[in-house]
Amino acid sequence: MELGSDDFLPPPECPVFEPSWAEFRDPLGYIAKIRPIAEKSGICKIRPPADWQPPFAVEVDNFRFTPRIQRLNELEAQTRVKLNYLDQIAKFWEIQGSSLKIPNVERRILDLYSLSKIVVEEGGYETICKDRRWARVAQRLNYPPGKNIGSLLRSHYERIVYPYEMYQSGANLVQCNTRPFDNEEKDKEYKPHSIPLRQSVQPSKFNSYGRRAKRLQPDPEPTEEDIEKNPELKKLQIYGAGPKMMGLGLMAKDKTLRKKDKEGPECPPTVVVKEELGGDVKMESTSPKTFLEGKEELSHSPEPCTKMTMRLRRNHSNAQFIESYVCRMCSRGDEDDKLLLCDGCDDNYHIFCLLPPLPEIPKGVWRCPKCVMAECKRPPEAFGFEQATREYTLQSFGEMADSFKADYFNMPVHMVPTELVEKEFWRLVNSIEEDVTVEYGADIHSKEFGSGFPVSDSKRHLTPEEEEYATSGWNLNVMPVLEQSVLCHINADISGMKVPWLYVGMVFSAFCWHIEDHWSYSINYLHWGEPKTWYGVPSLAAEHLEEVMKKLTPELFDSQPDLLHQLVTLMNPNTLMSHGVPVVRTNQCAGEFVITFPRAYHSGFNQGYNFAEAVNFCTADWLPAGRQCIEHYRRLRRYCVFSHEELICKMAACPEKLDLNLAAAVHKEMFIMVQEERRLRKALLEKGITEAEREAFELLPDDERQCIKCKTTCFLSALACYDCPDGLVCLSHINDLCKCSSSRQYLRYRYTLDELPAMLHKLKVRAESFDTWANKVRVALEVEDGRKRSLEELRALESEARERRFPNSELLQRLKNCLSEAEACVSRALGLVSGQEAGPDRVAGLQMTLAELRDFLGQMNNLPCAMHQIGDVKGILEQVEAYQTEAREALVSQPSSPGLLQSLLERGQQLGVEVPEAQQLQRQVEQARWLDEVKRTLAPSARRGTLAIMRGLLVAGASVAPSPAVDKAQAELQELLTIAERWEEKAHLCLEARQKHPPATLEAIIHEAENIPVHLPNIQSLKEALAKARAWIADVDEIQNGDHYPCLDDLEGLVAVGRDLPVGLEELRQLELQVLTAHSWREKASKTFLKKNSCYTLLEVLCPCADAGSDSTKRSRWMEKELGLYKSDTELLGLSAQDLRDPGSVIVAFKEGEQKEKEGILQLRRTNSAKPSPLALLTTASSTASICVCGQVPAGVGALQCDLCQDWFHGRCVTVPRLLSSQRSSLPSSPLLAWWEWDTKFLCPLCMRSRRPRLETILALLVALQRLPVRLPEGEALQCLTERAISWQGRARQVLASEEVTALLGRLAELRQRLQAESKPEESLAYPSDGGEGTGNMPKVQGLLENGDSVTSPEKVATEEGSGKRDLELLSSILPQLSGPVLELPEATRAPLEELMMEGDLLEVTLDENHSIWQLLQAGQPPDLKRVQTLLELEKAERHGSRTRGRALERRRRRKVDRGGEPDDPAREELEPKRVRSSGPEAEEVQEEEELEEETGGEVPPVPFPNSGSPSIQEDQDGLEPVLEAGSDTSAPFSTLTSRLLMSCPQQPSLQQL
């Protein structure tokens, strides 16, 4: 978008007012207040208070309207004159059958109107040609010099303008006695001037608002068309700026030529206006010679652009027609072949008689000069805004408006500066080259569509907030009918004046220069949307503005004198200001008011999409302007909206209802009106008209009582005729009624001349009633007659002013102030009297001083009204003065009795007046009271006061009257307070110090502070802390000197209490050390027993399983522990916290727990043994039984049965044993066929709750426990567990040492040796030949089987994978060869072994006897091939996962190397998950031993398998009983247990050194 280069200079801003809430409550009063300032500018802006925000009350969904169409360059007066001229000249050429194109000169369209005006101003065409001043014409048209533009302008003028100007002058018309044209009739009523055919072009329903800025495009090829038959082509096509320039791209199609000579030239002469590049324009003609004398010769062009084609008349064969063909110019009929017949009037003209003469016979339609002139002078159609064809809602109009603005300015609507829109608006309205069309929803009736303000009616219920705005004076529905407004006396709802109009605007939509009807005020409120830009001219410059506009555009005002009243004409404010018209501007934003004053011209446009509401109102100061407006309308013969006389008379008929200022203004106006009416009726009598009749004009419609001459609405009187009943005139135009005789005319009147003065008198009484009242008030307030009026009389005067609605004058304000002051005095005097009666209990602070009492009495005497309360006040003053004298005497006589002073003080309080001596009395009394309080506080027998009391006494002492006794008491109080604060601070430091002081120091501080007679809170706190410390020490001594070592819980409680005490305690450090040692031991024990991330506590593991008998209970408890939901019960043995302190009770409870555990496991084994196996469950389709800790349905292959509880578990959910772990660790030389030594024993996680350390590991914990002076529940549980394990070990050794079992063990040894000896010849069978290596593979495989988990480098990864695979293949291959049992176990032997096996599996300790019994039981039954097969499958799956993880680790290592980082150790990465996933007792034992080695420094030696001949087994078994029975002494079990452990491990001499 390219904006114009002509800058618009904004006019100065109009006044802006921001009323306060007090001013805002009276709208018309505030407007009257600002009128002296704002009226000088014509318009002003008012910003309401910030919180005045009326709700928008329009029903948006139902609001539909049809806007007006506005073509911007039709609005501006000067632009419209140019476009009208272009219409006329285009019409001139069109009616002659020729087409016209507006040429471009210097890349801009030629302004033909300005060219014509300048030629006239320079002296005319002939003068300019004679003086060769065409260059000056080009200069005045702002063309650059030196480009021969003057010649171009002359050519264009000669071809286009000059013929039109000659026709307009009428120089070549025949002067004949023809009937005059219609427009020459005298007193013809002019129609409003406008642009022809504009309203015949309906706007398009689509794309109606596109900016047509680039319309000056290359000229289209001329199109031959029958213009007469095609009505569309008769319309004018635009090539310039606006819809008023006619379409100039068509040529008339040749019709039948009316020539006598068929041999005439085929191509008529043509005037050509041709546009060339660079603005160089030439005029060419197809004729070889020019047809205008004295003109320059022109070049020729074979391609004309503009043609004027004419034709000859028809050749008729009848002779009588030939005789009638006479030229209208020369009156001759010769050379009839040169005669032309006009298509309009059939007159004949010689082609050489025309001006200018035609060299040849023209073609097409031709009209004579007379017809051309008549057509050009035809009055145009009325100008006005067209209505759009589309109906909008607010939403659809807003979308259209925002879209138009955003597209036009190529930016979001809210980002377009208002200055840019303003400049662009005035550029567009002044341009004839661009045509922008917008729509404006103007003058929408709020009565029909609803107001934007809330309205109190019955249509809908209003909220309290809406009700407030509905009654506000600033509501535009309320303001016109306010009491001070004149329009409230008009009954009719005048739309636009009394009833608001609504305006929905879009960018560039404008309202033209105008003043309000009857020169009234107007107020406009912008509800929401983008700003509205206003321009205003004050009323003093209204006539100047009209003169300037008439001077600049006389063509418009000659035909329409009231053009400015039609709201269709703009003129640039800069143009007006350049001619001396004062103009102001403002941007009205949402929520702001704009007020225009009487006869203030205003105009403006909208910055974008918005919604405004406007209405008129009239105040008392408007009445003179309204009367002048009627006279102005009478001169312009404009219709009135209402009758001004009727309004005045209607207000005069009820003067009591008028505001006083309004009554005075109406009286003045009516006086002038009555005088004028007397003069006019007198003139009527002088004319001889005496007939009259009364007429109630207010009952007649306005159109029936309008003067037929000046259109004024009559009310007081009118002149009518009996013979011409259809019309009447006002008395100012009595000569214009009709031609009838005066005797037939009569006066129609509303009031007689006697009635009018009566009405005037009532107004005068109303207006002058204020003066009468004011005189009464003045006499009363000034006491001019020497008599004070009573209070009632003054109130009556004030009531009269209120009832008669007198104005708020200074005198009324004085009266109100006097009444207010008098009533205040009466009320105060009554309060003074009632205060004396109430006595000293009245409210403090209401007493007046003696000086105030004297002033009050003087104030009452000075008031202009009489009050009987003055005597009461005088009596009170006398009493106060007498009391003052007595008080002075009492104060002078020292020392006075305190009782006397107190009684005087109480008497003074009853007076109700503050006497200065009373304050001295009060100070003396307060001094005595303070000294007494200090004496009581410091007395030895008194209760000790607090520091706050001491400080309060010091503060109170500073305000009492000074005396030596007071000074001494203050000194004693200050000294005592200083000492007390010093000791309080010392105690505070002791309580808050980081380094705690010993009890002795605190005792010394407390002892010294006891001598201070003040209550010290910190010293008291120190006493309490010291008492708690002594009690704590006593508790420590008691617990340390008891029969047993103290429990850890007790010590922890004492430590917690001791740490909180602000006393340094030596015993606390000892207790903290003991607690720390106990915690360290418990942590070591936890590491020894508990698995990583175990869900069991140490105490739970060491104690017997309390819920071993219930499978569901165990499973649910295990699941809750895994989820972190289950919290273990500390009373695992069924003992309370107090019972746990007795070692004997703990041992007995542990024994009972063992028995319950055995019974429970037997019951559980019976229950689980009755369960079907997972394979059996698979065969039953409807089975929903669940197994394992996961609680899922059986998984088939991969399920294992626990050897202790006999329940089933998924191999993927639990840790499973490795088949060859025992082969590799303990018996590496045994052959694989010794299947009873395979590690196939499986204990579920519910049965194997801990790591199950060996006894030698437990021995170190017991030795450390024996050194602890603290008792732990875990320690005693460990002791009991060890006793239980040793007891089971003794019984197991006894059974293993029996002859039968010893023989069975020997048989197994022989069988193992025989299998070892037979293994070498079978190596070739076990491993088939591979690559030529037959028997050499077995040692390699055996080595791999022995060291399968020892991969330590990346090079061995592939080897390990191969060996692992071979291990599994080898085991799978030998399964069919397994057979058994290899031993025969008698039932007498098997039963004790199974019982021992079960009891040993319950122990959370690892014992070698357990393994020996397991091998015997395994060898005595067939091999469990199903379990072996399951273990093989699980191990295959695990190894496959290990290979996958290994490859991933290797890829990660390689990527790290590629990035330049240090590669990870693949062996370490591979072993880490294996150690985590390793299972079985051996794996856990390895992990356990590694951790224990870290704790003990690697001094844990291995314990060999005990032989059957151990002499200590029976001794250990026998020595256990006395230990279990003598549980009362804690030292005995520890010493005995340690010695028995040493006997159980005879090859560990180093244990004695522990």
Swiss-Prot record:
Localization per Swiss-Prot or TrEMBL: Nucleus
Enzyme Commission number, as recorded: 1.14.11.67
Composition bias, Acidic residues: 1482-1497
Textual note on the cofactor: Binds 1 Fe(2+) ion per subunit.
Binding of Fe cation, residues: H514, D517, H602
JmjN domain segment(s): 14-55
Biased composition (Basic residues): 1442-1457
Region (Disordered): 197-227, 284-303, 1319-1364, 1437-1535
Span of domain ARID: 79-169
Membrane-spanning segments: none
Zinc finger (PHD-type): 326-372, 1187-1248
More info: Escapes X-inactivation.
Quaternary structure (record): Part of two distinct complexes, one containing E2F6, and the other containing REST. Interacts with ZMYND8.
Free-text comment about domains: The first PHD-type zinc finger domain recognizes and binds H3-K9Me3. Both the JmjC domain and the JmjN domain are required for enzymatic activity.
Protein name: Lysine-specific demethylase 5C
Protein source organism: Mus musculus
High-level lineage: Eukaryota, Metazoa, Chordata, Craniata, Vertebrata
Primary gene name: Kdm5c
